[in-house]
DNA sequence: CCAATAGTGTCTGTGAGACAGTATCCG
DNA sequence: CGGATACTGTCTCACAGACACTATTGG
């Protein structure tokens, strides 16, 4: 019964990589090639290795799956999931990380045999393996909250972007429509949120928009609060 | 080298139990009786057991250390700490939980040989074993944020409390002074925050104050935002 | 009466939301 | 010129903070 006091287990690190593509919030998923849940969609992840920090493991998985530099991207710990029966192979506790990426040209330059692809969150939110549906739900809610209180929305965009691009991120992630004029005033007035680059982008139609880059601020004071506290299933 | 792919480790669950006592934010700490960091202060915790969920383990530790029912108290997962060298005994990853308790008469009715006691956060914030200083910092910051956006402050109080008691919680946790009149209006007007019991409490001096119990709401709309974004080390 | 705490009413500045109006591109 | 998008100005309402004032106890 010393086993009760000293349970040995394996620790997995799973990734929820979110982006905004084609006007939708999308998540990077893989199709499982092996044993449990074979053929099912799942979040990318892997086991923690010796000598590795949790964040290091998350960054390593991120590179393996998307060829993205985890040290540059936004990457934050989400939560840890440890229900005894969450993995049929045995006791596996999973630390989930939330990553935010701009719209990448091709997601899967990975080396793994498993195919990786972007999928709209709405399309896969109930079809993932393990307890990944719950993890994805928690990740989306975290991202929505981060948009309220931090400058995270700029990470969804590329290195330079217009105020309209930034507004588009908010509208897609929150699933709302925002007044472009009020949003512009709000964002420009918030110190450290965005910095003008001096250049402009000429759209197919309409007046050219000023291009910005992300500012130095991390937190938003005051925050951009959502009107309704998100009551969508 | 299969060891690199399948690292086995032990998972600990550590608790940050906060309360407001004697006008200070205090945390429950134990004095370590055994091997690493013997005699040093540390957060209470223990290893995950077979068949146990993470939250179950946290509730079990909570009962062992404080004889409090973890199912009733506020208990939320804080974060997971997994630096390779965080525990001299070997690879141990720790899932930290944040618990909020009202001012208890005696903290240590626990069975463990280790002595448990309340200590002001300020007094122990740099003297804890392992990486518990960092965990404590994160926990306090989480609690401060929770007070802004949830009705968590009522959990610091007993089953019934006055508006002044509730204000006292905010003032101690945030380390600020609040206008009693504005605070009262704000709290009473927020639907679901507090419910009148119809009874009153007679203080040593002054007008009797109405007693309330916690309301049904969990989230605060709108939130009670701190003025300054906490720049204390 | 005074001291002390509880609670109400009022003013003011700030910011969000609504929306008219102006600016600048393409065709 | 019209169509479309970017951006500015103005109004209104709600709320946070400051603070005068009233209410209710004990001594």
Please provide the spans of the model-predicted regions.
Chain A
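Short, P/G- and charge-enriched loop/turn segments at secondary-structure junctions
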Residues: 1-5, 83-86
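N-terminal strand-loop-strand
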Residues: 2-42, 55
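Active-site-adjacent beta-strand/loop module that shapes the phosphate/pyrophosphate-binding cleft
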Residues: 23, 83-106, 139-142, 210-219
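The catalytic Nudix box helix
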Residues: 48-76, 97, 166
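NUDIX/MutT-family hydrolases
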Residues: 96-99, 107-143, 147, 156-164, ...
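Core RNA-modification/binding signature centered on pseudouridine synthases
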Residues: 9-10, 16, 28, 33, ...
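Short, solvent-exposed loop/turn elements at beta->coil junctions and helix N-caps
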Residues: 79-86, 199-202
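A short catalytic or substrate-binding loop motif that flags glycine-/basic-rich loops and adjacent residues
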Residues: 6-11, 89-93, 204
């Amino acid at each position: 019964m010393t086993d009760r006091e000293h349970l040995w287990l394996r620790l997995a690190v799973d990734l929820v990589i979110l982006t905004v593509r084609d006007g939708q919030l999308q998540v990077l998923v893989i199709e499982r090639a092996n044993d449990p849940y074979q053929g099912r969609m799942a979040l990318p992840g892997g086991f923690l290795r010796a000598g590795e920090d949790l964040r290091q493991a998350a960054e390593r998985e991120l590179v393996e799956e998307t060829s993205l530099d985890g040290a540059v991207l936004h990457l934050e710990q989400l939560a840890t999931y440890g229900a005894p029966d969450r993995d049929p192979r045995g006791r596996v506790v999973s630390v989930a990380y939330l990553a935010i990426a701009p719209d990448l040209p091709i997601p899967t330059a990975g080396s793994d045999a498993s195919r990786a692809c972007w999928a709209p969150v709405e399309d896969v939110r109930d079809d993932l393996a393990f307890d990944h549906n719950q993890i994805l739900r928690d990740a989306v809610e975290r991202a929505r909250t981060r948009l309220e209180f931090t400058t995270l929305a700029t990470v969804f965009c590329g290195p330079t972007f217009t105020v309209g691009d930034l507004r588009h991120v908010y509208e897609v992630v929150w699933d709302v429509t925002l007044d472009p004029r009020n949003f512009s005033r709000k964002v420009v007035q918030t110190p450290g949120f965005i910095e003008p680059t001096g250049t402009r982008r000429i759209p197919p139609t309409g007046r050219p928009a000023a291009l910005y880059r992300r500012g130095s601020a991390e937190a938003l004071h005051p925050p951009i609060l959502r009107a309704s506290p998100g009551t969508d299933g």
